[in-house]
Amino acid sequence: MSDNRLFTSVETLNLSSPVLEKLKLSGINTLEDFNTFTLEELRLLLQEAFLEVLPILKNFALPRNLQNLDLSEAVINILTELGMEDFQDLLQTKMAVLTKSFETNPLAFQKLNDLFKLYNHFPSISSDKEYGSRDYDYFKIRLAAPEEIRQWSYGEVTSYETINYRTYKPEISGLFCQKIFGPVVDFQCACSKKQVSIKSQFCNKCGVEFTETKVRRERMGHIELQTPIVHTWYLNSSPSRLAILLNIKTKQLEEIVYYVSYVVIDPGKTEFKPKEIITETQYSEALYEFGNTFVALTGAEAVKKLLENLNLEKTIKVLRKSLSENSKQKRESIIKRLEIIESFHQSDNKPEWMVMDVIPVLPPGLRPMVPLDGGRFATTEVNDLYRRILNRNNRLKKQMLQKAPRLIIKNEKRMLQEAVDALFDNTKTSKKNVNNVEKNRPLKSLSEMLRGKQGRFRQNLLGKRVDYSGRSVIIVGPDLEMHQCGVPREMAIILFKPFILKKLQETKGIDKKNANTIYEKMNEEVWNALEEVVKEHPVLLNRAPTLHRLGIQAFDPKLIDGKAIRLHPLVTPAFNADFDGDQMAIYVPLSLEAQAEARLLMLVSNNILDPKNGNPVVTPSQDMVLGNYYLTIEEKKDRTINSYDSAQRTAEHQFKHRNEGTFFADINEAKTAYQNKEIHLHTRIFIKPQTINLSFTEEQRQKYLMTTLGKLIFNDILPPSFPYINEPTQFNLDVKTPDAYFLPPGTNPKQFLKKLPTPKPFNKKFLSMIIACFFKQMKITETSKMLDHIKNLGFKYSTIAGITVSFADINTYSNKQELLQEVETRNIQIETWHKDGFLTDAERRRLVINEWKTIRDEIQEGLMKEFKQDNHIFMMSESGARGSVSNFTQLAGMRGLMNNPKGEIIEVPVKASFREGLKVSEFFISTHGARKGSTDTALKTAESGYLTRRLVDVTQDIVVIKEDCNSDRGFIVEAMMSDGKEIVSLKKRIMGRFASCDICHPKTNTLIVARNELIIESKAQEIITAKIKKVPIRSILTCNCEYGICAKDYGVNLATNKLVEIGEAVGVIAAQSIGEPGTQLTMRTFHTGGVASASDITQGLPRIEELFEVRKPKGKALISELKGKIKKIDKIRSQNPEIVITEENDPDTEHRYILEPNVDILVSKNNIVYPGQKLTSGSVDLKELLRVAGTTEVQKYILEEVQKVYRAQNVYISDKHIEIIIHQMFKQILIIDEGDTHLLPGTEITINKFKKANLKMLEEKKRLAVGRPIILGITRSSLRSDSLLSAASFQETTKILIDAAIKGKTDHLYGLKENVIIGGLIPAGTGILETTLFKYPKEPATTSELTKKTNQN
């Protein structure tokens, strides 16, 4: 502000006449005159007028001199050191700077704060944030004090008016007032004066500040309520926090708040007791009899008085004392009350702040009002709620001034209470909701703006739309390299606009404006600039739904014509994409950091392995498989063809392979012969191994190799370290080419070929094995090149093969009718037995169904034998390109048994195949299954998506934060079995993990793996060879880290096959790995058969949910509660069966278990049973197992059960992902005895808090607290998160915010969600370097410094 502004006359200011008169009398004629007085002198001179002058003093920073502000010498010295010359400098300083400078002198800082309060000035807290900086350490939430609400406010809203319908300008003192909230147009006041870009000046006439219009998104107002109002969150939410705090029943408290009853504050001469609740009638009678000698209040006023009278410290002491004396039921209610009272006592909240005298008004930018055509307005519903409050508040004010009757005022107060309730939460009000007139539904309150998928958290904070993005349909790009994608020029020209403009400015030496003009013309220069810009600039492609991290990957863009994005065919499995109209979104990383991350971490060619199990995710499919299958077929010349035109086709075949057994010098000679049609791709030929650049033994090099040209072409893409692949076997791949294919010199080739068996062609499974083997030996970049070669070969030779499907390819099975006749006869026999009473209906049904199943299998086997090797449909199935044996049986054999809508098998089968055609009745039977399939898929997708969301939420804060937590415990693993079959091998379970103790050979005692050594594949094989059945490994379940986990407990990162790095977000990866295959799981709960009492066995997705949510299982198994011996099993017909177990230590003590009738008993007499062992079939109740057998057994059980469900669908997920989820289910502990800690018995707290409390007691040599572990379902675990932001954005938003506000909770921002919400870098990946957990030195530290640090650690 220029100094000449200080010579403005006070008469031009917007001041009342009495104030102007006082200023004149004090000798203050201009603003400069204020500088001649101190603050205290001004206060004494102006008296009550001082408050009216204060805003002017603040706006012009008066008095200027720091000495005139009544600050102590110490404060002035600190401010001078900071380089502040006057009051204006002080007002422009950020709070962060002041806080730091006054750290050592809190009393001086208090003085400065008092000055700010007087001037209603609150310095800016946030400093200018740079990219990725973290200048905040935590996020705190608490109740707002009335003074704070007034301090946030820029003025009181007194009128319910919004916008003038004629001028479209905001009304003065209304909900959109420019004086309170700031100007509607940048630097323009309400009377349309303009001021150019100088802030902090006010219009003399209308009082609006000249500033940017964006302040309307941050400036708040307030409404001064004529009567106190209770905040509905603390009254109407269940359980009512206010009711618990005041120890009043919720219903009674509601009656007080809504002016139905009165509460006695001071009984005076009456017979009432303090805090007694009386009715309106009782109050009127007492008032009539005793007059004003007693005090009884109603409404929020009464609640406020009760809260103010609460002595928290005293109440805590009384309650703690009564804890030990009362019954269990009373103790629970005392603990609930204690929790709330202690929350208030330990935080800087006051209970009376739950009753409001003033409410804040949201900035108008967040509740806009837009004029529509025809003079109507579209408005946010919050505005209607505010208008209702203002209407009722103003009416109440008027009635109070007019001294209206008590009844009328009471009714108006109740209506005001309801209006404020509706503003904060319009769903909870016990009274009638405030409805939208047009749509007849409750208006959207502030709580609704936060809740649910459309709420602020999930819609705007966790998922934002981003610029520089586009979307288009995808088509195949067979000519692309692995790391490329085709981007349409039309898209790229817009997406890369800023880079093109920069390029134009650099090359042509022009300014921004001219560059824009050239860009608009879209001439040759612009397109050339685009070609330059796109080079080496990766883009991200994403396909919804993004089920796992491979759903968004980086590619190098290649500009193409047309309008569709082109995608490399090999990356489709990772995106689960196909080319039937799928769309993909494209994003451009802008900053250099983002581009580097995209290239190094997200490029497709670096993401070849699936994070869930470490298998290659980019395996060739369909045409690529078919082409390679066709290429590697080997045919004998002397084969006879039996089908149609057999003579002609046999002759053609023999002519094609007429030169079988020919010797060639090298591959080029063989190719020339093929081009001249002397040999075929499948003809068996001989070649010298020396001419092939692959691995052979010395002995093999002296002989001739028998192979085909097709196989020579295929082997040409393999590196020299590989053996020549001549047959699809593990031996050929891992060891060498079998010697059987080598012809010793001097041997008759014709005789040699006759004896030699024909190897199978290379199918999809074998191609995957080659890729996995290649990946182990080579770098990622080499693998991606090799994959491109496989793709090119596949497409080329599937085109050359010209494989088609025709009607003639489907041959019906010759023996079908005889087989059907046999079954019909047998079924008639079964029917006869049933009629004669030898079979029950259920048994008859089972036998009939089994007969049809057997016959279908027989037809299937026969069909496969009749199918010829060169049948195109057979080739598709055999190669793994498309279709399965079952599909062909339905095409050419018989469709078989179908299910009805309930999922039960229909007895009558579909006898026809699709080749023969179905009857109407058969077609009808088939429709049930098809319809059920579609509905199941739709339900499954939603269910699976919700499961993934819960899993991500429960694990999102699990990040690898250190190398080693030095845990001395381990987790013992063994091969996983189900029904006697091995479902996960021991080798798979231990590979890539660390040993928790030394593992020695059981016979020789030689060390195989040392403690804390990584078990690599060769070591795992040694362990298996040594016949070790149980291996102790480091596990996430035994990790000692306070937050996150350590690298040693996690092991190898399956996506890279290297040790996991610090900062890896392993929690999210685990959740995605379990959730992503969720759609492949079944939705069924299977019936065990016709037995009425047999329980349903839950499988598939419902079973996973049952385990992770810790629900009581259907068909619960009975478990043993002790270690002992089974004495007897009684199966008495009239009663339920009974198992008797004797204790191991005390054989005389017997435990009896009564069973349900018809259950399968899994144990027999004299068996030894252990705690937690299943006695009957079914699923175990996890809470029961935890009580009986302890944590480790439950963790092991969950791990095995989850694996069983996924393995049943042939999905393999690494144990470590499931372990992370289980780790999160066991993060809380139930306090049994509090010892000398501040913990409350019966409460559930995190293990970290429990450990800290006990460590403190150990230091002070006091009694420790005792607790027992509890198991939480993933939803409950998410809601109990230490982070209030993470929990609130998940579910039950208001409930979590209510509790967090009462406790004055602090969120230390350890997880990912919290940081995304407040717009910071996540503490994972490259962002972990910025967090408070990791302080890396800016400059390289000297060796002496590093040694010093290590010693300190």
From Swiss-Prot:
Enzyme Commission (EC) number: 2.7.7.6
GO molecular function: DNA binding; DNA-directed RNA polymerase activity; magnesium ion binding; zinc ion binding
Reaction catalysed by this enzyme: RNA(n) + a ribonucleoside 5'-triphosphate = RNA(n+1) + diphosphate
Record region (DNA-directed RNA polymerase subunit beta'): 118-1353
Job description of the protein: DNA-dependent RNA polymerase catalyzes the transcription of DNA into RNA using the four ribonucleoside triphosphates as substrates.
Gene3D superfamilies in alphabetical order: 1.10.132.30, 1.10.150.390, 1.10.1790.20, 1.10.40.90, 2.40.40.20, 2.40.50.100, RNA polymerase II, clamp domain (4.10.860.120), RNA polymerase Rpb1, domain 3 (1.10.274.100)
Family (UniProt): Belongs to the RNA polymerase beta' chain family.
Cofactor dependence: Mg(2+); Zn(2+)
Name of encoding gene: rpoC
Binding-site list for Mg(2+): D578, D580, D582
Assembly, per entry: The RNAP catalytic core consists of 2 alpha, 1 beta, 1 beta' and 1 omega subunit. When a sigma factor is associated with the core the holoenzyme is formed, which can initiate transcription.
Protein name (record): DNA-directed RNA polymerase subunit beta'
Residues that coordinate or bind Zn(2+): C189, C191, C203, C206
One protein family per Pfam: RNA_pol_Rpb1_2
Keyword Magnesium in record: yes
Superkingdom of the source species: Bacteria
InterPro entries: DNA-dir_RpoC_beta_prime, DNA-dir_RpoC_beta_prime_bact, RNA_pol_asu, RNA_pol_N, RNA_pol_Rpb1_1, RNA_pol_Rpb1_3, RNA_pol_Rpb1_3_sf, RNA_pol_Rpb1_4
GO biological process, one term: DNA-templated transcription
Keywords: DNA-directed RNA polymerase, Magnesium, Metal-binding, Nucleotidyltransferase, Transcription, Transferase, Zinc
Family matches, as NCBIfam families: rpoC_TIGR
EC category: transferase
CC per GO annotation: DNA-directed RNA polymerase complex
Unknown: annotated span: 1-117
